[in-house]
């Protein structure tokens, strides 16, 4: 294969896109156009009938790859020396191999193919561009500067046009980037909406999960309470003899305590009743057993009550000592018992007023004793039963 034939085809197609003033590169968006120019060359050769060719050169999949590259890398600069590597990475075949395999019956591009397609002549774009540059230089340059070198004039015009071209390219690049930014913002907003939707779903799922956990805990608590119930089958098998025996023992102890307190209350009440009967019989019959009654009276009264009663009696006797003669006259005048009864009764029992005073103090001591005894019994009963 002649390297010159492939280079001529490639340079021809490259020159249709690349501008001499912009540098030795094309943009990524121009890649499909470059491939289309090469395909047009081979289609014209097939129409002329000079060569048998395998067309199309590129499949639809490869063309889709070229279009995707041009859309994603619109302003990516493809330099001429980097084109082979970029093309091979896209279709996994070099461009030279694809063009050579297009010819049927030969293994390389025929040398007369270049002449028949008139690929040696410079492109019309380059010729027209050169004519415009020379015309523009002659028109825009003032007469006083015609003495300057034509090369300098052309270089100045080329620099200005190059700058204009670069500005236009930058504007297009900026517009494309702005559109990409808008598209990205739209995608970001959509992603935010989807994220919020997923967050709401996650929150609802988490709430349901917590509700299920709570329901599970409630069921577990109910099951545990059922197992701890004494009537449940798990507890019925436990030996309850010890518990019942303890209950019986405590009940028996409380019953004994109640019986003991009842007996004590009966004894104390019986003693008080007997004391009341004795005092009543003394008041009614005025028996001569004064000393024995006085001893019983002393033993029945507590020590502190006895002291109070003694003080009261002493005070009463001191008061009555001065008026005793008058009392005797009054008593003997109204109450004249027989000689036998006077001998049987004590001197104070023969007096109605003195006997009433003594029996009044004795009744007071009996009532205080009974009240104190009942209070002690009530306190003991309250301590036993925790009242």
Curated annotation (Swiss-Prot):
What is the topology of this protein in the membrane according to its UniProt annotation? Single-pass membrane protein
Q: Which residues cross the membrane?
A: 311-327
Tell me the keywords, alphabetical order: Coiled coil, Cytoplasm, Cytoskeleton, Membrane, Nucleus, Transmembrane, Transmembrane helix
Q: One GO CC annotation, please?
A: meiotic nuclear membrane microtubule tethering complex
Write out the similarity annotation. Belongs to the MPS2 family.
Task: List, in alphabetical order, the GO biological process terms annotated in this UniProt record.
Answer: karyogamy; meiotic telomere tethering at nuclear periphery; mitotic spindle pole body localization; protein localization to spindle pole body; spindle pole body duplication
Keyword Mitochondrion listed = no
Q: Where is this region: Disordered?
A: 216-235
- Out of the domains of life, which is the source? Eukaryota
* Recorded coiled-coil stretches: 117-232
> What compartments host this protein?
Nucleus membrane; Cytoplasm, Cytoskeleton, Microtubule organizing center, Spindle pole body
Listed name of the protein: Monopolar spindle protein 2
Q: Which GO terms describe its molecular function?
A: cytoskeleton-nuclear membrane anchor activity
General function of this protein: Component of the spindle pole body (SPB) required for insertion of the nascent SPB into the nuclear envelope and for the proper execution of spindle pole body (SPB) duplication.
- Biased composition range(s): Polar residues: 220-230
- Spell out the InterPro entries in the cross-references: Mps2 (IPR031433)
**Tell me, how does this one assemble?**
Interacts with BBP1, MPS3, and SPC24.
Q: Tell me the organism's taxonomic lineage.
A: Eukaryota, Fungi, Dikarya, Ascomycota, Saccharomycotina
Q: Where is the signal peptide?
A: none
